[in-house]
């Protein structure tokens, strides 16, 4: 069974490789997963993965950034599940590339932190975070597990730099901790996980995550209201889910900002409060309070607009 994290990585590996940003993404791969060898006074750099899409991504990044085609070696593991293993081997200009990416310093020493040119550029930071997640990141399925996204680092200073990228540029409220022989940065807030997926370019995965999160949170809210009438709860949840679906369609096809102001306010409030009943929405909507029938009338208008957009498409 393909995991949710695998789906996210599949989407990321399908993104176009931008020449200006390839080096930042490649730097994350090589710094986090590269294995350097020296034979006959020649450097060789290997990156191994069981994911063929990631292997192709690394190949494309190297070719785009430096015009070099590395070797791509496929082998079959003989232990456990006997999966295929993909090795990307760079044998040309290894020293020059590692120096250019600031993985080596001028004295051929290893730099384990993230270079300043990435730490000071939001666009490069986005590309580096994408590479870091592909190299050693994971995210739980929002439908079945607790909300959790993490990236593993071998070195503490690299982990702290990842934390700074995530928090200083993108305000993700990331945390850090020690993990066995290394370190991790992690996110626990569902909203921040969705933001991270969007930042690194996994837009479809982010939309799927948000849909699952909304439905999961709605189910949890329903379960907490144990003293309420079950039939009424189901009716409220179903109505809210349909309203959210209509609003999301309008947002995608038309833009909420193009609605009349009263409908825009209500639509955005409903997206952030899918668990509220019609009565609660009427009492708490920002331009309210208004009557329950007034709220219902606005939702009917939203429903009509969504229906029209469906028919047009």
From Swiss-Prot:
It holds the Pfam family LAGLIDADG_WhiA. GO terms for biological process: cell division; regulation of sporulation. Residues 277-311 bind DNA. One of its GO terms (molecular function) is DNA binding. Keywords: Cell cycle, Cell division, DNA-binding. It comes from Lactobacillus johnsonii (strain CNCM I-12250 / La1 / NCC 533). It comes from the Bacteria. The keyword DNA-binding applies. Belongs to the WhiA family. Involved in cell division and chromosome segregation. The keyword Cell cycle applies. NCBIfam families: DNA_bind_WhiA. This is Probable cell division protein WhiA.
């Amino acid at each position: 069974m393909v995991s949710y994290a695998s789906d996210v990585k599949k989407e990321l590996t399908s993104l176009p490789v931008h020449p200006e940003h390839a080096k930042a993404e490649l730097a994350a791969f090589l710094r986090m997963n590269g294995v350097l060898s020296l034979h006959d006074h020649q450097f060789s750099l290997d990156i191994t993965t069981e994911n063929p899409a990631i292997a192709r991504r690394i190949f494309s990044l190297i070719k785009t950034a430096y015009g070099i085609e590395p070797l791509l070696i496929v082998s079959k593991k003989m232990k456990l599940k006997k999966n295929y293993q993909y090795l990307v081997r760079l044998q040309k200009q290894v020293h020059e590339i590692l120096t250019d990416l600031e993985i080596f310093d001028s004295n051929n020493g290893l730099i384990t932190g993230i270079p300043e040119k990435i730490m000071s550029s939001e666009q490069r930071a986005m590309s580096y975070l994408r590479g870091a997640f592909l190299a050693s990141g994971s995210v739980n399925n929002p439908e079945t597990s607790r909300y959790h996204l993490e990236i593993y680092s071998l070195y503490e200073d690299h982990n702290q730099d990842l934390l700074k990228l995530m928090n200083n540029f993108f305000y993700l409220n990331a945390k850090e901790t020690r993990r066995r022989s290394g370190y991790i940065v992690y996110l626990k807030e569902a909203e921040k996980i969705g933001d991270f997926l969007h930042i690194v370019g996994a837009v479809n995965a982010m939309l799927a995550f948000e849909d699952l999160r909304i439905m999961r949170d709605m189910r949890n809210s329903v379960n907490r209201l144990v003293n309420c009438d079950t039939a009424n709860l189901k009716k409220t949840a179903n109505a809210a889910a349909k309203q959210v679906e209509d609003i999301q369609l309008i947002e995608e096809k038309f833009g909420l900002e193009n609605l009349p102001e009263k409908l825009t306010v209500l639509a955005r409030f409903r997206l952030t409060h899918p668990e509220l009943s019609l009565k609660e929405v009427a009492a708490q909507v920002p331009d309210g309070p208004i009557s329950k029938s007034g709220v219902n009338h606005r939702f009917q208008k939203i429903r009509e607009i969504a229906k029209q957009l469906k028919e047009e498409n």
